[in-house]
């Protein structure tokens, strides 16, 4: 039997094997189920027509028809309409993603066809007896202005009307799209099933992407004039009749754990009193229970959030000390952490608001236990308590699954982005001001193995002002595919995302993480720091094989910043700036005119850096005599044109780059 590789590897990264090949076993499985159950004649005819079309396409493109993805439609119908064996369920579970739109009844399922560049949607319980219509669509940030919506209509018990529409810029009107792209293949009182291309090449449709997408939905009993070119958008306010959900639509297949025997462990706070202040970092140093004399691999971790809305993010740090060395137990504010416990700084697992369970790929796991392993860890939880509530107690933490069967690679976590420092500032009144953190070529050259590392997971992180985050990958003067990008990032939805494309980072490569911030409501500059009112810019990447490099981050160099404040005081006559004063006070005293904002941006983009090329204990790698004054990686400023592959592409479809709607790089995000 021909063996089909699960992955294709290159110097740039790892792609999942060709979509059609990956589905080969699913296609066979669905075929045999259909044969065994002797489906109705109509379904057999549809299947035969699909196979004939598949064969024609395969001959035209030089591919075996067996591997073409047309059977994905039949597979999805099989998964959602009848029970399968346990084996087939395990196979199909990786393809099918699900979410409840109203948290109890209306279930949205979808499958991503990467080969055909389309998504198949399935809705359950969208209608009930009294509903006349249901809509599902996408908007940029959850609002109803300029939304892309498919309307489904029940006409006197006949569920056969669907209309592709878009909303007006004020969100008050619905207009019929001249190009209809909501392709329905099943619609009745229980089920809606339709598909959409990633990019319909329709300027009135939103392009489906791998970042955060906002799904808008509603249903109602009133009759709509869908045959009209324009009608008023129904005003639905009941929570079980309308809503918005954030999700990653174009996501990688789910990962199944191949090991059948797993050990479990919980690392949680123990009755931690939440202080009645806005920001607290709470630390709990504890000794791990269980038999860790034998080496294990962590294969999955699940957040246990006991105080939703207050717990902002959490991390577990391992204490890198001798096997028998005692670390003082502690349960209190991290600012009073015992000095000896500060050795607990190697990141193991982490979570931020909006994230769920994270599963490692079958080839890698996070090492824990074994000879020489110190059993102490530090759980750090960020409490965000803006209302300053008192009397709250928290027991949040993680549930961890481990396997005694070791996998091929040890995995690890690395921090990319900006240092947590007030050397970086964001002027007030900005729509999307960018700050970039660099992992420079000298650092990866000093720290990574010759064959490089494979990044399989990524979690982007900012505080309240972040609106877009991306990490770019450079090899010399060539820019490779981005590691991760979220143009519609929300700090309320900070998923740890398994990457569909897994980049390989080689020694000498550079990674540039850029965060964009909205400070329209701020009166003074926002600064980098730990408080929720400060800002961060981080990409936590999960990768293998593990290295000693844990932090690859930057900030503007001390000398550059000192010269900047001298210039502000002596040339720009900003008399609130004091040359020996606190950086935060200096930034906040500046009157931010547009030329001064441009000067700050230019300084951050072009001037030398202070680099953190650090091991987990804080020591620097020896790749340079000094990591102060390092040249920033040159970043090409470019305006992405997403629809350049459309056959009838018209540049006029792009929105004008009007001031206030776009960032400094000329990219419109709102």
Curated annotation (Swiss-Prot):
What does the entry list as the binding residues for Cu(2+) B?
461, 463, 536
Stretches of Low complexity bias are at 38-61
Catalysed reaction equations from the record: tyramine + L-ascorbate + O2 = (R)-octopamine + L-dehydroascorbate + H2O
Deleted gene: phenotype: Flies survive to adulthood. Mutant males are fertile, but mutant females are sterile due to defects in ovulation.
Q: Which GO terms describe its molecular function?
A: copper ion binding; dopamine beta-monooxygenase activity; oxidoreductase activity, acting on paired donors, with incorporation or reduction of molecular oxygen, reduced ascorbate as one donor, and incorporation of one atom of oxygen
Q: In which tissues is it expressed?
A: Present in head and in neurons innervating the oviduct (at protein level).
Which CDD domains does this chain map to? DOMON_DOH
- Give the start-end ranges of region Disordered: 26-63
What is its subcellular localisation?
Membrane
Which positions form S-S bridges?
Answer: 283-334, 319-344, 439-552, 443-613, 515-537
- For this protein, the parts annotated as crossing the membrane are 65-81
User: Which Pfam families does the UniProt entry name for this protein?
Assistant: Cu2_monoox_C, Cu2_monooxygen, DOMON
- Please list the residues that bind Cu(2+) A: 312-313, 382
Domain (DOMON) spans 104-220
The free-text cofactor remark is:
Binds 2 copper ions per subunit.
Per the Swiss-Prot or TrEMBL record, the active site comprises 281, 461
For this protein, the Enzyme Commission number is: 1.14.17.-
Please give the cofactor(s) recorded in the UniProt entry for this protein.
Answer: Cu(2+)
Write down the glycosylated positions.
235, 614
The UniProt subunit note reads as follows: Is most likely a monomer under physiological conditions, although under conditions of high pH and low ionic strength the dimeric form predominates. Both forms are equally active.
What is this protein for, i.e. what is its function? Answer: Catalyzes the hydroxylation of tyramine into octopamine, a neurotransmitter involved in ovulation and locomotion. Functions in an amine-mediated Bacc-dependent signaling pathway that negatively regulates acute ethanol sensitivity. Involved in facilitation of nociceptive escape behavior in response to potentially damaging stimuli, such as high temperatures.
Listed name of the protein: Tyramine beta-hydroxylase
Question: Gene for this protein?
Answer: Tbh
């Amino acid at each position: 039997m021909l063996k089909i590789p699960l992955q294709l590897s290159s110097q740039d990264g790892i792609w999942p094997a060709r979509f059609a090949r990956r589905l080969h076993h699913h296609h066979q499985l669905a075929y045999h189920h259909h044969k065994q159950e002797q489906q109705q004649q109509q379904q057999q005819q549809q299947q035969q027509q699909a196979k004939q079309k598949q064969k024609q396409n395969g001959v035209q493109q030089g591919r075996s028809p067996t591997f073409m993805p047309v059977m994905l439609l039949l597979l999805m119908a099989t998964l959602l309409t009848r029970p399968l064996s346990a084996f087939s369920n395990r196979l199909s579970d990786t393809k099918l993603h699900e979410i409840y739109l109203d948290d109890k009844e209306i279930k949205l399922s979808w499958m991503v066809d990467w080969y055909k560049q389309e998504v198949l949607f399935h809705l359950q319980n969208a209608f009930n007896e009294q509903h006349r219509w249901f809509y599902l669509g996408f908007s940029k940030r959850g609002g109803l202005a300029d939304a892309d919506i498919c309307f489904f209509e029940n006409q006197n018990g006949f569920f056969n009307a669907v209309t592709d529409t878009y909303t007006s810029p004020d969100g008050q009107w619905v207009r019929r799209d001249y190009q209809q792209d909501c392709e329905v293949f099943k619609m009745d009182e229980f089920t809606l099933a339709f598909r959409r291309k990633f990019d319909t090449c329709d300027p009135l449709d939103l392009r489906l992407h791998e970042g955060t997408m906002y799904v808008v939905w509603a249903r109602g009993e009133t009759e709509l004039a869908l045959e009209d070119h324009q009608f008023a958008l129904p005003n639905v306010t009941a929570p079980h009749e309308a809503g918005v959900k954030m999700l990653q639509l174009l996501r990688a297949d789910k990962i199944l754990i191949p090991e059948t025997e797993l050990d479990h462990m919980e690392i949680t706070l123990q009755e931690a009193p939440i202080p009645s202040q806005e920001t607290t970092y709470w630390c709990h140093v504890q000794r791990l229970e269980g038999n860790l004399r034998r080496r294990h691999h962590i294969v999955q971790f699940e957040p246990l959030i006991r105080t939703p809305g207050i717990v902002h993010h959490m991390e577990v740090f391992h204490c890198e000390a001798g096997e028998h060395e005692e670390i003082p137990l502690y349960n209190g504010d991290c600012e009073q952490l015992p000095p000896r416990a500060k050795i607990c700084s190697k990141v193991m697992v982490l979570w931020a608001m909006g994230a769920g369970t994270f599963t490692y790929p079958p080839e890698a796991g996070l090492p824990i236990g074994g000879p020489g392993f110190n059993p102490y860890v530090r759980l750090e939880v960020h409490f965000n308590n803006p209302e300053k509530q008192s009397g709250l107690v928290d027991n949040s933490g993680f549930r961890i699954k481990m396997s005694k069967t070791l996998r091929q690679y040890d995995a690890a976590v690395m921090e990319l982005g900006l240092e947590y420092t007030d050397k970086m500032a964001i002027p007030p009144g900005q729509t999307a001001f960018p700050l970039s953190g660099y992992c420079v070529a000298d650092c990866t050259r000093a720290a990574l193995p010759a064959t490089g590392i494979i990044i399989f997971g990524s979690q982007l992180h900012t505080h309240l002002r972040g609106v877009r985050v991306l990490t770019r990958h450079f090899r010399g003067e060539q820019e490779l595919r981005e590691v991760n990008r979220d143009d519609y990032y929300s700090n309320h939805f900070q998923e740890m995302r398994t990457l569909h494309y897994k980049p390989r980072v080689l020694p000498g490569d550079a990674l540039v993480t850029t965060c964009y911030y909205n400070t329209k409501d701020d009166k003074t500059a926002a600064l980098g720091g730990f408080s929720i009112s400060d800002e961060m810019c981080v990409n936590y990447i999960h990768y293998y094989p593990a290295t000693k490099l844990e932090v690859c981050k930057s900030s503007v160099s001390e000398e550059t910043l000192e010269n900047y404040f001298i210039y502000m005081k002596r040339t720009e006559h900003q008399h609130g700036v004091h040359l020996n004063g606190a950086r935060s006070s200096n930034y906040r005293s500046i009157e931010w005119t547009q030329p001064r904002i441009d000067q700050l941006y230019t300084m951050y983009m072009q001037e030398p850096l202070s680099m953190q090329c650090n091991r987990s204990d804080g020591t620097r790698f020896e790749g340079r005599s000094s990591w102060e004054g390092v040249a920033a990686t040159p970043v090409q400023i470019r305006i992405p044109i997403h629809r350049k592959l459309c056959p009838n592409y018209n540049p006029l479809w792009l929105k004008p780059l009007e001031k206030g709607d776009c960032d400094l790089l000329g990219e419109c995000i709102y």
